[in-house]
Amino acid sequence: MTKNNEAGWNLDHSYTTLPQSFYTEIPPTPVSSPELVKLNHSLAISLGFNPEELKKEAEIAIFAGNALPEGAHPLAQAYAGHQFGHFNMLGDGRALLIGEQMTPSGKRFDIQLKGSGPTPYSRRGDGRAALGPMLREYIISEAMYALDIPTTRSLAVVTTGEPTYRETKLPGAILTRVASSHIRVGTFQYAAARGSIEDLQSLADYTIKRHYPEIEAHENRYTALLQEVIKKQASLIAKWQLVGFIHGVMNTDNITISGETIDYGPCAFMDNYDQGTVFSSIDTQGRYAYGNQPYMAAWDLARLAESLIPILHEDEEEVLKIAQDEISKFSVQYEKQWFLGMKKKLGLFSNEEQDQSLIEQLLKMMEKFKADYTNTFRSLTLNTIENTALFESPEFKEWYKLWQSRLERQEESKENAYEMMKNNNPSIIPRNHRVEEALEAAVTNGDYSVMEKLLEALSNPYAYATEQEEYCVPPVPTNRPYRTFCGT
């Protein structure tokens, strides 16, 4: 069943120009009684949709997979992945790409239904999703967007009227995810594992045309592709670290070629600064701990380089050298981006030799005194040194003098320094206890007002507005560590 186009659907399906081994065409599985519980108005408008039309029953049916919009071409994408270091052939086990929306400005975005039913890649899964994890992805992805961190986004969440069974019976839901594309490091691993150089080349050419058209005429365009992805990921991971975001499941199937954050299953934001922070219940070894994220990104990108080896160069020795040289650039690029970001967080415009030491000393003290990561930088930005173990310590007072004298030595005024800090230190993040509170109200009581208030506050994290202050309060200390789950 195909619906008409008053809502503004303008779908293309360029992914189907790839060899058919990369996808399986399959319709979504209908649900019994869909209900729209969240629509992203501003995102809808930017994509060329009419939000009021999207609220109508006929369009809600599309978000539920009960109907298809004009021009839809539903398919599940195939890919592989190293999951916690172990290689598997995978694919969209509970999601369908229904098409690529062409926006009024000529941009192309994947429209994917997540939780739309089983596919040939489901393995033993039911292809469905629960309401809590889908609302969680909506909240966190929109918070990331407001923090100016490249991310997939959420257009809508519908409940299905059907239960989903995990450890317990949960209300089912479908999320409409929007992405620049869903091409992953794992997509290239999939092509390489199948052994067809032609397919691998087709994927690389398609990816370049879609994401990096400026390198199409490059003499060594596949090396240039690797360079671009490394650059994008170095920038992305630096941005994660600078706001204390912990992804939780940095498997190669969750590393996008576009440089967007994808898959918000077991992610969370750090409260107390600790390099070893882990939230994911399945990351028992701390593989994807906060401090490990840059190293794991480099590891994942090395898997991309391995996958590209058949098309990087004909000479075996030369190709290994190219791959190793490019991967070694990741840490340099990451460190540069992170250091620049940290300098902005401390209001440092100019360069001085001891800047690195100044930053490291602060972080060391924050870890020692278990200081709240976001609120420490917030207090420095507001120049309100509160009564905390960190700020009361003699070593911090000594550091504070050094920092103040460093600010005084630069040409820019202190006012300008504090303004730059304000633009780089969010006063509000999606605190784990606040997210849980919003999900509990929505899922258990059908009360979405708590989530709406939270989303409103998170939409402007650099505002330092008085009405946001209740969301700046860290959780009450507890002996029970906060744990996240992938929701699959």
Curated annotation (Swiss-Prot):
<keyword id="KW-0548">Nucleotidyltransferase</keyword>
<feature type="binding site">
    <location>
        <position position="114"/>
    </location>
    <ligand>
        <name>ATP</name>
    </ligand>
</feature>
<keyword id="KW-0547">Nucleotide-binding</keyword>
<feature type="binding site">
    <location>
        <position position="93"/>
    </location>
    <ligand>
        <name>ATP</name>
    </ligand>
</feature>
<keyword id="KW-0464">Manganese</keyword>
<feature type="binding site">
    <location>
        <position position="177"/>
    </location>
    <ligand>
        <name>ATP</name>
    </ligand>
</feature>
<keyword id="KW-0808">Transferase</keyword>
<feature type="binding site">
    <location>
        <position position="263"/>
    </location>
    <ligand>
        <name>ATP</name>
    </ligand>
</feature>
<feature type="binding site">
    <location>
        <position position="126"/>
    </location>
    <ligand>
        <name>ATP</name>
    </ligand>
</feature>
<feature type="binding site">
    <location>
        <position position="184"/>
    </location>
    <ligand>
        <name>ATP</name>
    </ligand>
</feature>
<dbReference type="GO" id="GO:0070733">
    <property type="term" value="F:AMPylase activity"/>
</dbReference>
<keyword id="KW-0067">ATP-binding</keyword>
<dbReference type="InterPro" id="IPR003846">
    <property type="entry name" value="SelO"/>
</dbReference>
<feature type="binding site">
    <location>
        <position position="127"/>
    </location>
    <ligand>
        <name>ATP</name>
    </ligand>
</feature>
<keyword id="KW-0460">Magnesium</keyword>
<feature type="binding site">
    <location>
        <position position="91"/>
    </location>
    <ligand>
        <name>ATP</name>
    </ligand>
</feature>
<feature type="region of interest" description="Disordered">
    <location>
        <begin position="108"/>
        <end position="127"/>
    </location>
</feature>
<feature type="binding site">
    <location>
        <position position="94"/>
    </location>
    <ligand>
        <name>ATP</name>
    </ligand>
</feature>
<protein>
    <recommendedName>
        <fullName>Protein nucleotidyltransferase YdiU</fullName>
        <ecNumber>2.7.7.-</ecNumber>
        <ecNumber>2.7.7.108</ecNumber>
    </recommendedName>
</protein>
<dbReference type="GO" id="GO:0000287">
    <property type="term" value="F:magnesium ion binding"/>
</dbReference>
<feature type="active site" description="Proton acceptor">
    <location>
        <position position="253"/>
    </location>
</feature>
<dbReference type="GO" id="GO:0005524">
    <property type="term" value="F:ATP binding"/>
</dbReference>
<comment type="similarity">
    <text>Belongs to the SELO family.</text>
</comment>
<keyword id="KW-0479">Metal-binding</keyword>
<dbReference type="Pfam" id="PF02696">
    <property type="entry name" value="SelO"/>
</dbReference>
<comment type="function">
    <text>Nucleotidyltransferase involved in the post-translational modification of proteins. It can catalyze the addition of adenosine monophosphate (AMP) or uridine monophosphate (UMP) to a protein, resulting in modifications known as AMPylation and UMPylation.</text>
</comment>
<feature type="binding site">
    <location>
        <position position="254"/>
    </location>
    <ligand>
        <name>Mg(2+)</name>
    </ligand>
</feature>
<feature type="binding site">
    <location>
        <position position="263"/>
    </location>
    <ligand>
        <name>Mg(2+)</name>
    </ligand>
</feature>
